[in-house]
Amino acid sequence: MELLFKIIISYFALYLVILLHELGHSFFYWKFGCKENWIKVTVKPYLFFSTPALVDENKADLLKDKDDLIISYAGITVNLIVALLAVVLNYFYSSNNVYVNLFISQFISLNLVEAITYLVIGNIYLVSDMKILLE
């Protein structure tokens, strides 16, 4: 039973990481006028193929490269900021509860893994993207 509870806590941490990542994209789609409600995102229970949902594709296609790049990086930026906040919280709040510690450590690790995965394995190339930002 303890193992099942740990799996559920880890799943919840992963779900929350993906939800926050998608909210990062969604917020900037909304800010650039491609979405009516930035809170509405789709994160499926099986976690794959999550999207910022309900994006006006016609408006999104007309975005400048710089705006499109900001939207692309918004998800990993949220992951990095949230991981940093969780590290600070973990530093100041120490718990004797093994489940709270598991959640916090999983949450920090998964946020960092999510960001690193997109930076290293994904189709994001920092050098070429920085050129777009500087234009």
Describe every region a protein language model picked out.
Residues 9-64:
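Small-residue-rich helix-interface/hinge motifs
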Residues 1-18, 79-95:
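Long, highly hydrophobic alpha-helical transmembrane signal-anchor segments
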Residues 55-135:
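Metalloprotease/metallohydrolase-associated module, dominated by Zn2+-dependent proteases
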